[in-house]
Amino acid sequence: MENIIARRYAKAIASRADINDFYQNLCILNSAFVLPKFKNIIESNEIKKERKMEFLDSFFDIKNSSFQNFLRLLIENSRLEYIPQIVKELERQKAFKENIFVGIVYSKEKLSQENLKDLEVKLNKKFDANIKLNNKISQDDSVKIELEELGYELSFSMKALQNKLNEYILKII
């Protein structure tokens, strides 16, 4: 449910001309969500909505009336806690709009930057898009490339290769 709500807000922001200003301001607020005190203030029903607006305004040197109206809307609808999801969804929509996609390479060992760049170049050609890959360490012996936004997943497992090789040898015998 919260993803649907965040998606609607992000879609509305993505259609604006000042999307980058909104995105930067939301990122500032999003970084504050790691602080428990900030979350307590945002989620508190005891703090008046006007005080919450003043508190959030204090994060910004330059006031943007459109962004302030957006914050008021979130406050009025008690949806400030959706800001992290809105930021995440907005990042996804911006990337889609700019034809940039982020993928994850799962491997047992950390891949070198050179290997990641090589994979990026090959995937860029395959999908005719700008692919950025991050490396995450996993426990299994397989290598897995996941591009969630494009619905692409490729995995190579030594165990699976070994099993297929054994089957092939048994068929020959």
Curated annotation (Swiss-Prot):
An example molecular function term from Gene Ontology annotations: proton-transporting ATP synthase activity, rotational mechanism
Any one Pfam family match given in the protein's UniProt record, by short name: OSCP
UniProt keyword Ion transport present: yes
UniProt keyword list: ATP synthesis, Cell inner membrane, Cell membrane, CF(1), Hydrogen ion transport, Ion transport, Membrane, Transport
Known role: F(1)F(0) ATP synthase produces ATP from ADP in the presence of a proton or sodium gradient. F-type ATPases consist of two structural domains, F(1) containing the extramembraneous catalytic core and F(0) containing the membrane proton channel, linked together by a central stalk and a peripheral stalk. During catalysis, ATP synthesis in the catalytic domain of F(1) is coupled via a rotary mechanism of the central stalk subunits to proton translocation. This protein is part of the stalk that links CF(0) to CF(1). It either transmits conformational changes from CF(0) to CF(1) or is implicated in proton conduction.
Sequence similarity: Belongs to the ATPase delta chain family.
Protein name, per record: ATP synthase subunit delta
Native source species: Campylobacter jejuni subsp. jejuni serotype O:6 (strain 81116 / NCTC 11828)
Taxonomic lineage from the root: Bacteria, Pseudomonadati, Campylobacterota, Epsilonproteobacteria, Campylobacterales
